[in-house]
Swiss-Prot record:
Principal subcellular localization: other
Intrachain S-S bonds: none
Keywords in alphabetical order: Actin-binding, ATP-binding, Cell projection, Chemotaxis, Motor protein, Myosin, Nucleotide-binding, SH3 domain
GO cellular component, one term: plasma membrane
Function, in words: Myosin is a protein that binds to actin and has ATPase activity that is activated by actin. Involved in the process of phagocytosis and appears to support streaming behavior.
Name of the protein: Myosin IC heavy chain
Region (Actin-binding) location: 571-593
UniProt xrefs under PROSITE patterns: MYOSIN_MOTOR, SH3, TH1
Gene name tied to this protein: myoC
GO biological process, one term: mitotic spindle organization
Length: 1182
């Protein structure tokens, strides 16, 4: 498989080998030569199988860690791209996902070799690729990712320092565990820290610095913090000037302090806790400035009490108690098990300085541990899942003077080397032997003997001897170091140990190191004086007290744990944790001790190559196997690759796992030399073979996905075709429904437009029913209340006459006549324009001035003053409107019923309506006037004579208007002639004792020639109107179709002739206003007596009504020939108002199909063959 180089790799010429297992000649010199070639070309990473070798370049290589490079390594195997720390991170993360096992990355090497930077890149990669980048729905995941990245600057500030070998040397060890959820997203974490070099707080070698945070704080603190905590430049504090080095080349402490503050904020440390941290840092610096001066009697006293006072203020402890704790040591005499007397023993200057430094070291050590615990608290995840650990621990150190700290650091590195040997050399070879694999053992150095020298119990190791001496000398300092050198001589039997005067030498895997004996016992005790502990626990600062929860037990004889015991226990726990995980190794190399770029010292690097055991590692890798797995695990991973073990992604194998493994390898044509079968595992020799299997496995799913996609595309194409057909059918169906809906909506709008007027009319009819004879014009059921028959809003002369009322909403208007009372003549009717608004009644008269018609306001009556109405009981048109404060209004109008209804509706109440043969009302000038009403059958016109109205008889007072059918959907509407009957239309039942108007019988002509009445004028909107009657077949006059004329009764004109018959079905006019069709002709015998039953009237109330004829069921039997249909001729034109009705013209011939009831018949129009309902009084039989 050809390697694909990322962009940064393609920009440089590849020198040397990416994988040193491919060296033609294996030797340390060849390894050095390969590393040197690559280093000179800025290629710092090289592989030995799965082990990454990293050489510290001491410079930034442009593009090596960019986001583009990081993305290229996602999902790639280690042989596909050049060696890189991202490749190790990718393999670690994918191994956790695929193998479902914990992983760890062990980074080893000496101080300054680049371990910390490698650890940061590992965590950066895992945080970047795990989950969905920057878009995770889980806020906890995003928070943990932020903490993973921000712990590095925070812990580096408090735990790293400049040393002679490294400008950013880790002075503590940490093992960072990243915990993942089921979605493989980081959801928790834990940091374990090891052996902080707290002695650096009070002492540094020449050329070294204290921990970074002190210099950052001194230079980056705000003016307020400087004032409050007494912070100045680092040159002002004794603890920061021990090494005579205050700066690091290329490092800005102010910028670094800003990063440290930001890390605290991201991790979640609140401002008040940050303030306490900085306060304790200032206290430590000022403790270092406390100096002592000797006095007589080997005593000391504090030289400058102002410094003591300021330290007391920072620690929130009483100044005199702190002074006593620093100048004296509390002692207690004992008598057996009984406590004796306590007294203070003065300290000499050396003891006082040691006590002062011990106090500063204890505060910093507890503060550092608190920071680690605070980070762990933010990342705590109670649900434990898979884990990836990253070990970044101090590297192997050798100085001119090496003490207890270097001894502990090198011990931990010795343990890590032992783990490396166990996994890469010893355990691998032992496994080959155990599995029966053909193998030639390769000798290697096992450093187990060195580890036993340091941590052994029998014979005792160096740590055990240190603890024994500490217990023996207890609180005595004199002679402790000499006692150690005497006791440690028992280790001379170990070939890796030797004594040299006041020191001893240990032959580590990385070389011989001489450790100085003096001071080791005191540092191993690692105890805080009881006096100092007591003074800290009495502090008023709860944060400081929380750092020292120790319980002081003066009666306990148990000695506290030593530093050696703690580091040995922590190392054992670390090894146990690492052994439970699958390890991945990064071996770092330091190219020079000058910490300068582009310099590789051959001898220095060769020494590291040797003690790291790279040569042995290459030999074992070349002779060994790249991959091994149990039969079952291999089968479960790769069963997809053989047709014998898999079908459509399902496991179909029925045999044992070993046979399945053979079948899988055979199906992939793997040669027998490329693998071996052990007792329980299968071993793959070359990594290329393993990656080929993985690529085939991935391609299987790709091929399956392609097949599924093709099938899905075919299904989608089929679905699309079906969808188009359904859409077309549905579109046609929607068009059909739309056309139907439009037709229905047209009828519904017409019905809806008329419905409120009909309802208002039907309600108002109850006021008149049985109390006043009715005009035939009023009985036309189709006529709706139009209201504004004069169209006042478009007539400016009306608006001008109304003056202030011109902006009022008009609800009624018509031409009318009012009763006027001339002084010297009889009362008479005078023409007026009657306009009713929502506020008042207006009477406007037309007056001629200088041959010009002028409209003037005659009278205005507010609606609020209208109290009641009076009408006669006869068929006249007089309406008297009574008012509360003005004289009454006596007006004649064809629309009296509508006028009463609209005024009642506007006032929101039903005013009293009085009926009688005479009406008394107040006329102008405050006097009363009485008009009477007389029946006069000799005159068809209504006329007024001497306050008497002469009126012919009208329709009986019990006559009612037929209600409009409001449910046309229940009546079938055939679209073409059919032979079967149609259901009976729904006709409203008459109310109370009233009757519904029927077709009248023909009336006899009068003795003289018929008197033609003036046509009824209509409003501009189209008011009801009548035409002159045409002669009936018998010679009697018949009503013609009325022609529209401008608005209500003409002023000064006579009353309108009423139609001879009423129609019980609504017929709309083209303009939306009601329009009368031709009425049926009157009978030759003339009008019937008033109140007498005639063919035009239904049965009186109380008698049963004829039920509607039910629709007969069709029968399959052949019917006999139907008799010839009865034919009728249309007397008037009729426009259908509802879907089931028939539209016809005058003189059209109609075949009668069925008489549904007396009012409505079903017929067939001969001209168009259409079938529908028709009013019976509009036709006459031929």
């Amino acid at each position: 498989m050809a390697q694909q180089k990322p962009e940064w790799g393609n920009q440089m010429k590849n020198e040397g080998l990416d994988d040193m297992t491919l060296l033609s000649k294996v030797s340390n010199d060849q390894i050095l030569d390969n590393l040197k070639k690559r280093f000179e070309k800025d290629i710092i990473y090289t592989n030995i199988g799965d082990v990454l070798i990293s050489v510290n370049p001491f410079k930034f290589i442009d593009g090596m860690y960019s986001d583009e490079v990081l993305q290229e390594y996602i999902g790639k195997s280690r042989i596909e791209l050049p060696p890189h720390v991202f490749a190790v991170a990718e393999q670690t993360y994918r191994s956790m996902i695929n193998e479902k096992e914990n992983q760890c990355v062990i980074i080893s090497g000496e101080s300054g070799a680049g371990k910390t930077e490698a650890a940061k890149k590992i965590m950066q990669y895992i945080a970047d690729v795990s989950g969905e980048r920057g878009s995770s729905s889980n806020q906890k995941v995003e928070h943990v990712k932020s903490i993973i990245l921000e712990t590095n600057p925070l812990l580096e500030a408090f735990g790293n320092a400049k040393t002679l070998r490294n400008n950013n040397s880790s002075r503590f060890g940490k093992y960072f565990e990243i915990q993942f959820n089921q979605k493989n997203e980081p959801e928790g974490g834990k940091i374990t820290n090891y052996l902080l070099e707290k002695s650096r707080v009070v002492f540094q070698l020449k050329g070294e610095r204290n921990f970074h945070i002190f210099y950052q704080f001194c230079r980056g603190a705000t003016p307020q913090e400087q004032q409050e905590f007494g912070i100045y430049g680092p040159e002002n504090f004794a603890y920061l000037t021990k090494g005579d080095t205050l700066d690091i080349d290329g490092v800005d402490d102010v910028e670094e302090f800003a990063l440290t503050r930001n890390a605290m904020n991201v991790i979640g440390i609140p401002a008040n806790e940050q303030k306490q941290i900085f306060k304790l840092l200032a206290a430590i610096l000022w403790i270092g400035n406390i100096d002592f001066k000797e006095q007589a009697g080997d005593k000391v006293t504090i030289a400058d009490t102002s410094v003591l006072d300021f330290v007391s203020q920072l620690l929130d402890v009483p100044s005199h108690f702190l002074k006593t704790a620093l100048e004296f040591r509390q002692m207690e005499t004992r008598h057996g098990n009984q406590r004796g007397t306590q007294y203070n023993v003065p300290l000499n200057k050396t003891q006082a300085i040691a006590g002062r430094d011990a106090l500063a070291k204890a505060i910093y050590d507890r503060l550092f541990n608190w920071l680690v615990d605070r980070i762990n608290k933010e990342m705590d995840n109670p649900q434990k899942g898979l884990m990836i650990g990253v070990l970044d621990i101090y590297g192997f150190e050798v100085f001119d003077r090496n003490g207890f700290e270097q001894f502990c650091i090198n011990y931990v590195n010795e343990k890590l080397q032992q783990i490396f040997i166990e996994f890469t050399l010893k355990m691998e070879q032992e496994e080959y032997v155990r599995e029966g694999i053909k193998w030639e053992p390769i000798p290697f150095f096992d450093n187990k003997i060195v580890c036993e020298l340091i941590e052994g119990k029998n014979p005792p190791g160096i740590f055990s001897i240190l603890d024994d001496v500490c217990r023996a000398v207890h609180s005595q300092a004199e002679g402790a170091d000499q006692k150690l050198l005497q006791s440690i001589a028992v280790c001379k039997s170990n070939p890796h140990f030797d004594t040299r005067g006041n020191a001893f030498c240990v032959k580590h895997y990385a070389g011989d190191v001489v450790y100085e004996g003096p001071g080791m016992i005191e540092k191993n005790k690692d105890t805080l004086l009881k006096d100092h502990l007591e003074i800290l626990q009495m502090s008023a600062n709860n944060f400081l007290v929380g750092l020292f929860p120790d319980v002081i037990d003066t009666d306990s004889k148990k000695l506290p744990s030593t530093a050696g015991f703690k580091i040995k226990s922590q190392a054992a726990e670390l090894v146990a944790t690492l052994m439970k995980s699958t390890p991945h190794y990064i071996r770092t190399i330091k190219p020079n001790d000058l910490k300068k770029p582009n310099i590789l010292e051959g001898g220095r690097v060769l020494h590291q190559v040797k003690y790291l055991g790279l040569l042995d590692n290459i030999k074992v890798r070349r002779a060994g196997f790249a991959y091994r797995a149990t039969f079952d695990r291999f089968f479960q991973r790769y069963y997809l690759l053989s047709d014998k073990t898999c079908y459509a992604g399902n496991n179909i194998w029925k045999g044992d796992a070993l046979s399945a493994c053979r079948a899988i390898l055979a199906s992939q044509n793997v040669d027998n030399t490329q693998y071996q079968i052990g007792k329980t595992k299968i071993f793959i020799r070359y990594p290329e073979m393993l990656f080929s299997l993985e690529e085939t496995r991935e391609r299987y799913w790709h091929d399956m996905a392609s097949r599924i996609k093709n099938a899905y595309r075919n299904y989608k194409a089929f679905q699309f075709e079906c969808s188009n057909r359904i859409k077309n059918a549905f579109r046609n169906y929607k068009l059909y429904r739309q056309r139907c809906a439009q037709t229905i909506q047209g009828y519904f709008r017409a019905w809806k437009q008329a419905s409120p007027f009909f309802d208002l009319r039907m309600q108002n009819e109850q006021l008149f029913q049985g109390r006043k004879e009715r005009n035939r014009f009023s009985m036309i059921s189709v006529r709706k209340y139009f209201g504004d028959y004069l169209d006042v809003r478009s007539q400016s002369y009306f608006l001008d006459a109304m003056a202030e009322g011109r902006n009022e909403d008009v609800i009624f208007s018509s031409k009318s006549q009012v009763m006027v009372h001339p002084i010297l003549s009889a009362n008479k009717l005078s023409p007026r324009f009657l306009i009713v608004t929502k506020q008042a009644i207006y009477l406007i008269k037309l007056k001629q001035k200088k041959n010009l018609a002028t409209y003037l306001l005659d009278r205005r009556v507010p609606l609020a003053e209208v109290t009641s109405f009076s009408l006669s009981s006869l068929a006249d048109n007089l309406l008297v409107i009574h008012t509360s404060t003005q004289f009454d209004v006596a007006v004649t109008t064809e629309f009296k019923t509508e006028l009463v209804a609209l005024i009642n509706k506007q006032k929101g109440t039903t005013l009293a309506v009085n009926f009688g043969q005479s009406i008394q009302y107040f006329k102008k000038k405050g006097s009363n006037n009485t008009v009477t009403f007389l029946k006069d059958e000799m005159h068809k016109e209504i006329f007024l004579k001497k306050n008497q109205f002469h009126i012919a008889s009208g329709l009986p007072a019990s006559t009612t208007v037929a209600k409009v059918r409001k449910n046309p959907s229940q009546v079938s509407t055939p679209s073409k002639p059919i032979a079967k009957p149609v259901a009976k239309p729904m006709v409203a039942k008459p109310s109370g004792g009233s009757v519904i108007m029927k077709k009248p019988a023909p009336a006899a002509p009068p003795s003289g020639p018929p008197v033609m009445k003036k046509p009824a004028p209509t409003a501009p909107g189209g008011a009801p109107m009548m035409k002159k009657p045409a002669p009936a077949p018998g010679g009697a006059p018949m009503m013609k179709k009325p022609a529209p004329v401008p608005g209500g009764p003409a002023p000064g004109g006579s009353a309108i002739m009423k139609p001879a018959g009423g129609v019980s079905k609504p017929l709309p006019s083209p303009t939306g206003a009601p329009m009368m069709k031709k009425p049926a002709p009157t009978a030759p015998g003339g009008p019937a007596p008033a109140g007498a039953p005639t063919p035009m009237m239904k049965k009186p109330a109380g008698q049963p009504m004829m039920k509607p004829i039910a629709k007969p069921q069709p029968t399959p039997m052949k019917k006999p020939a139907a008799p010839p249909p009865q034919q009728y001729i249309a007397l008037y034109e009729y426009d259908a108002m509802q879907p089931d009705e028939l539209t016809f013209k005058e003189n059209d011939v109609i075949n009668l199909i069925k008489k549904v009831d007396a009012d409505w018949w079903q017929g067939e129009l001969v001209r168009t063959k259409q079938i529908g309902m028709l009013p019976s009084n509009y036709v006459q039989q031929i």
